[in-house]
Amino acid sequence: EGTNLMGEVAGKEKPEVLMTLAELNRLLEADLKGWPQYEWKDGRTLVIMRQGKRYEIDTDKKVLVYVFPIAKGAQNVTSNGQELLAYTKANNLYYVDANGNEFAVTSDKDPNIVNGQTVSRNEFGINGGIFWSPDGKQLAFYRKDESQVGTFPLLDINSRMGTLREIKYPMAGMKTQQNS
C-alpha cells in the first residue's frame, strides 16, 4: 500500500498496516522516500542496515529496540537478540557491544583460515557461520581451513572493464576445506 508496511494477521480477513514510512522516518531520524531493504528477525522485529548501523525495530510498539554501529567492511552480521552484535571482517570474527566497543574473537593472519562464514555454500539447510546460544551469552562459529583448496577465477562484471577475482572453491574430486 504505497508507503505502508503491510502484514497478514492470523484470523483477520484483510492485511493490516504494521508500520508507516513516516513512523520509520521518525525512528531512524531520516527522510526516506521509500522502504529500504529489510529482514524480519522474528514475527515483530524488523532489521534494517543503514549508514553503518543495524537498526532493530519493534513494529508493535513502534520503537527502536537496538541500534548497533557496524564496522566498515563487516559481513555476516548477526545479533544475539540482546545487546551484542557479531560479524566477520576479512577472515576474522568480532563482536561489538551496544556502546560500540569492538572485541576480536579470532585473530588469524593466514588468509586460508576463515572464521564465522558459511561452509559448503549454504548447503544442508545451514545458513551462516555464526551462532548465538539461546541465552545470547556464548558464541559458536565455523572455522574453515582452506589451505589445501584450489583457487577458482571469477569474472567481476561490476567494473567497467571486467576484472578477475579469485576465490577458494573445492572442485569435485579435489581436496576440500577442513571445518571445525
Regions found by a protein language model. Give the residues of each.
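Beta-propeller folds
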Residues: 1-180
